[in-house]
Amino acid sequence: MEFSAKWITGPAAVDRDSEVAPYFFRKQVTLPENVEHAVIYATALGIYNIFLDHEKISDSYFAPGYTEYNNRLQYQEYDVSSLLKEKNRFVLTAELADGWYTGRLGLCNKENCYGKKRALLAELHLTLSDGSKQIIGTDASFEITTDGPRRHASFFDGEEYDARINIDNASFVNVTEYTGTVPPALVPMQGVPVRLHEQLKPKRIFQDRDGITLIDFGRNMAGIVKIGPFTAKEGQKVVIRHGELIQNDKLYTGNLRTAKQTLTYTCKEGVNEYLPEFCYMGFQYISVEGMEVSEENICAYEIYSDMESIGSFHCSDERINQLQRNIVTSLKANFVDIPTDCPQRDERCGWTGDIAAFAPTAAFNMDITTFMKKWLADLALVQKEVGVVPWICPSNNFINDRTSNFWAQNFDQCDALWGDAATLVPWAVYQSSGDISVLEQQYQSMKAWVETEKRLADIAENDSPRYIWKHGMQLGDWLAPGKDMNDWTDCAKWTSTAYYAHSAQIVSKTAAILGKTEDAATYDALFHTVCQAFRDTFVEPDGHITDGFQSIYALALRFDLLLPEQRPRALRDLLDDIRTRGNHLGTGFVGTAELLAALSDEGKVQEAYDLLFQDTCPSWLYPVQCGATSSWERWDSLLPDGTINQSDDGPQDMVSFNHYAYGAVGNWLYTRIGGLSLVEPGYKTFRLAPAIGEQLTFAEVSHKCPYGTITCRWEKDALAEHGYTLKFHVPEQTRAIVTCPDGIQREYTSGDYVLS
């Protein structure tokens, strides 16, 4: 679509009067007679809401969304026909806050990363009964003020709202045309809107040691708090602070870094009600000062991109069920227009490594196809700009600012797993959805990433052989327990070479699917060459990996880096390491997703169960034992004595309690315990083969694939040792390959089945 309207903004005087208050635009509109259809198209430098006579036209949040603004900006389309019925005059208004464009962004902790001025572009398209059309667009006839009730709005810091202010009585001035830089491409909405979802009532209302009211909403989340209706005096001030934990009988906010996560509401006389519009917080607990709270006048809403829930998992052990709930909670909390690392501190960036590890788990639980295709398109754009896949996407404009800090200075460094998001994420989306367009969209990006890995692995450094990637800054086995940052990065030559091989294999498979036979052969040969180099460099003939560690053993087994005769020794070494640690895992971000499958797929199902059911630190169930309601960034974010981990083994204050990377274990819950794994993309053909361990008596899984909902439940037979009953449903147009209770593999077409 081509806009004929003008970009509008505030004059310099408006910005001087209030650098932090949202812009508020308005225009009186007189409608022609016989309007049959009305549509608003809108976008902004910032984040906006549009109103007709003070009625918000959409329930979405944070439009136009976060894209790589150096390259493109989304616009939205709203059908407002029903809102204009019976109207001949109305006030068209828009509120515009900083958002990602001019607001403070993570890692750099700077404002105005993409630009210094907010601006709005909008058109109202009217279709009359005679078929004629009229367009009313933003232009010099609009007015602007910053004297509205919302005095401040920031993703990290929250909002300040003064209910005593009536916007209709504010002092408006004429807008000015915005003539600055705008993103070169305006594109229709590519992703899915962010919306409010589950409402949470207080689970507990209590006081801290100073008598300040605290509220526990029962689980960690990304969301906002609504207050009201409640009666107050004019000028009464309500202050709400958000945090993930209570420590020493006080709300803990130390891990927020510089983010304030605070709502300040100044009351009008009488009945008050308030819901923020331009921020969200990461929290389970809040402190409230300035009002009497009850279950009736305060609640919280989870906020995340509007994706359909398509997967479920349940079993006989409530701790594992809580682990699954934690996985889904952190998925939702960190899918707020882009896949972020965390929803609470002053970061909230699109970290590529986190989603690379977590994508298969995410794709099972939610329909992430549209969400991820939008983000992947930006990944390809950033990759093209800087020549590599960076640590974060969108870039926070580090492309044009390399001086802010360590992350900006090293933005164009290449990193295994983080960079491999270019291959792993589109592959996971394609496998789950069967949507080949994601591979078509991303193929050049996928191929370019493997070529980058190839170039870096060919750099001779300290006499390293070809195809072994040792060059450059690497995060390595990030956050592996019992180690520090130097240890994590020292693991990189093993893990980066492993992911290099894996990505080459994915590109080969992708090329074959897309009919690019020459590329398929080229990258298949590269995969085998890198595997050979890995074995020649790191692996002894019997399969022992020199200076091996859990993550590299897991990757070597899962990525087929070893010869068949080497696998038994590698498996034995992995098991020995686990036993040496007292049946504890030792993996960081790069290996955790593959660890249990490396055991169970080599026949060590019970050993995998034993590791999953470990409940002392480090383990998946340790946070559950501590009462966690979301996935943690570190295995030991909370120490056994109940205090926050304040260690200095990484970036300062890096302790999030809502971080999905280690939740990647979910994929093993669904595919091995639940037994459901795909054979063909989109589950056109799927496998049902539960891996049954002694700790569970039943497990059930369901997944809504493009053809219908697959269900599978197994339950042990109390009367027969090793016996169990298998109930499953095969949707129309699909085929199931089932490992039956008698151990024989059979195929089933659509229908419901019970096997014993």
Which residues fall in each region the model found?
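Extracellular/oxidizing-compartment recognition motifs
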Residues: M1-R345, G353-D354, I368-K373, V386-P394, ...
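Carbohydrate-binding surfaces of carbohydrate-active enzymes
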Residues: G10, S508-D524, G603
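Alpha-helical support elements that line or immediately flank enzyme active sites
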Residues: V39-A42, I224-H242, F278, D354-V382, ...
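Active-site acid/base region of carbohydrate-active enzymes
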Residues: I47, D139-S141, T145-T146, E295-N326, ...
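C-terminal capping/lid segments that line or modulate ligand- or cofactor-binding pockets
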Residues: L92, E160-D162, D346-E347, T352, ...
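Non-catalytic C-terminal accessory modules of carbohydrate-active enzymes
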Residues: N112, K116-A119, E123, I136-N166, ...
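Amphipathic, well-ordered alpha-helical segments in soluble domains
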Residues: D354, W375, W418-V425, S503-I506, ...
